[in-house]
Amino acid sequence: MAVENVRLLKGVPLFAHFNEKELGAILKTAKERTFAPGEPIVREGEQTDIGFYLILEGQVEVKRGGRTLSKLGSGQFFGEMSLLDGAPRSADVLPTSSTTCLVLSNWDIKALIKTYPDIAMKIIAELARRLRQTDMALTE
């Protein structure tokens, strides 16, 4: 499962430019957690130190104000922004089936950055890329 998880992480844009050593460190730090259908993973407005979730198995719905915004499945992720800024959650995330996630807290990522400082620049570069895409989409 570890090799499979490295492949999954490598497929996440946030981690796409990480080397094997950095990905291995993330996998050693991250926790695997399983959620029952309907059990809230995160709640809109909630303040938490757990930031990033990578879905290993299962499916979730992302909802705001009771309205479904998106559905995510294996290999997809959520919570990457609060991993860095710790802001309250912008939506509810609820599993529609038994769902297993790889979970990375804000504290975990800060500890990893101390050991692997290049991680910070790689994360910043990806966030800048996403911000640029959003800016371009808004100006079109």
Question: What residues fall within each predicted segment?
Answer:
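Alpha-helix boundary/capping detector
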Residues: 35, 41, 52-56, 84, ...
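Flexible, active-site-adjacent loop/turn segments at secondary-structure boundaries
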Residues: 6, 12-16, 39-40, 67, ...
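Regulatory nucleotide-sensing modules
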Residues: 5-6, 10-65
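A small-molecule sensor/coupling module
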Residues: 5, 22-25, 89-90, 107-140
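Cyclic-nucleotide recognition modules
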Residues: 68-124
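Generic structural signal for short, solvent-exposed loop/turn connectors between secondary structure elements
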Residues: 61-73, 138
